[in-house]
Amino acid sequence: MDALKVQILPDNQSSPSSTHMLTKPKSKKATKSIAMLIVASLAITLGLLFVFSSNSVMFSASFLRRSSLHYSVIIDAGSSGTRIHVFGYWFESGKPVFDFGEEHYASLKLSPGLSSYADNPEGASVSVTKLVEFAKGRIPKGKLKKSDIRLMATAGMRLLDVPVQEQILDVTRRVLRSSGFKFQDEWATVISGTDEGIYAWVVANHALGSLGGDPLKTTGIVELGGASAQVTFVPSEHVPPEFSRTISYGNVSYTIYSHSFLDFGQDAAEDKLLESLQNSVAASTGDGIVEDPCTPKGYIYDTHSQKDSSGFLSEESKFKASLQVQAAGDFTKCRSATLAMLQEGKENCAYKHCSIGSTFTPNIQGSFLATENFFHTSKFFGLGEKEWLSEMILAGKRFCGEEWSKLKEKYPTTKDKYLHRYCFSSAYIISMLHDSLGVALDDERIKYASKAGKENIPLDWALGAFILNTDTPTSDYNGKSRKMIGFK
């Protein structure tokens, strides 16, 4: 029965007519309004219930994931500094899931590198202890004992004599044993350049979603570190066994060329060039001045206090380091000098072809990412993504040919010890990629990068090491998600 609105009427009005006018027409409006109100109320109630239930499910899933997170820590002991990486991961259907977003990944770098403690191994404990404390602040205390921590040293440490390496590693092992993390002495080690290249290749192709597919459609990596350079990719030609590694992903096997060119990292190569200049009679004016075409004009310095900062000079060269360097600032001459250095020993090549020295290198093919100092130098010059090698030549010529005083005015926030190196690095990059490895100046298949993929995953070899060192079953990853489930 419809609800009626009833009014008390004056005595002189006719109740039937008044009742008719008040009840019948307005009952439809009232009924419609009330019905709409009821429907709206029900809709709002159902909506709120849905939101609350959805949020509850999401909260529960998030809470369960956080409570079931596993953690792993890797310390990258590089030549210029030591960086700690803290990873969080979880399991789905019994398989680990890796996510390198900010919620599950953190890192911190401290300088100098562990190799700088060659004369004082105990000094290495200070930076490692600070890094360990950083990791502890990002992992629940109750999970420290179950979280593994590994230290992997690279080219800077590889350059040291083995006894010195072990002295430094023993100091770090002592710190890690008492850290509260899960640790074994063999987890602090000096890794090979080949392993470093493989790790970088893994994380790059994980980020790009190309793992599990055609090996020849994967992306290669060329890295320019401080002490070494790495070239890693899947070639189409036969590779001598000493230069190849095979890894399996799901049902796909990848035969990878990976080689580390020790002493050809940016810092080591610059010091090596200085050594060559010192030994060259033609480069010296005979009055204790050595001309350096890879340093901008107007920059004169004592080689021992300025150039030996990376610690890569030999003892014989350090003796000569009291010579004064006369900056010549000539990109073309610098390019020629660095190319001669890269080609030294090529006459002893025992393989089909050698691109750098007497080391076998397959013909470069497919897509590549140029990382580390390739990226840093390109960003410094503000190069575009296309034909950046051609742009590098122009930028290098301008920079090398500029007076030092003007460069300091143009780049006031860049420290001198870094600023003057961009002349060398621009010429060295061209000598390595174009003149030695044969990459065309207009080849758009090679790009400089520090991150890759839609999720901008850092192209850091330590991330690849984390993936490969995590105990994982065979993968069913389909290449479409940034989450990589199971790699072995």
From Swiss-Prot:
Biased composition, class Polar residues, residue ranges: 10-21
Main localization category: membrane
Family membership: Belongs to the GDA1/CD39 NTPase family.
Gene3D superfamilies reported for this sequence: 3.30.420.40, Exopolyphosphatase. Domain 2
Cofactor(s) listed in the protein's UniProt record: Ca(2+)
Entry EC number(s): 3.6.1.5
Region (Disordered) location: 1-26
Segments traversing the membrane: 33-53
Stated role: Catalyzes the hydrolysis of phosphoanhydride bonds of nucleoside tri- and di-phosphates.
Keyword Ribonucleoprotein: no
Keywords: ATP-binding, Calcium, Glycoprotein, Hydrolase, Membrane, Nucleotide-binding, Signal-anchor, Transmembrane, Transmembrane helix
Residues exposed to the Cytoplasmic side: 1-32
Molecular function terms from GO: apyrase activity; ATP binding
Topology term for the membrane: Single-pass type II membrane protein
Subcellular location: Membrane
Phenotype caused by lack of the gene: No visible phenotype.
Residues forming the catalytic site: E196 (proton acceptor)
Induction / repression: By wounding and drought stress.
Native organism: Arabidopsis thaliana
Annotated protein name in UniProt: Probable apyrase 5
Sites where the protein binds ATP: 73-83, 220-230
Glycosylation sites: N251
GO cellular component terms, A-Z: membrane; plant-type vacuole
Stretches assigned to the Extracellular side: 54-488
Expression across tissues: Highly expressed in young rosette leaves but only weakly in roots.
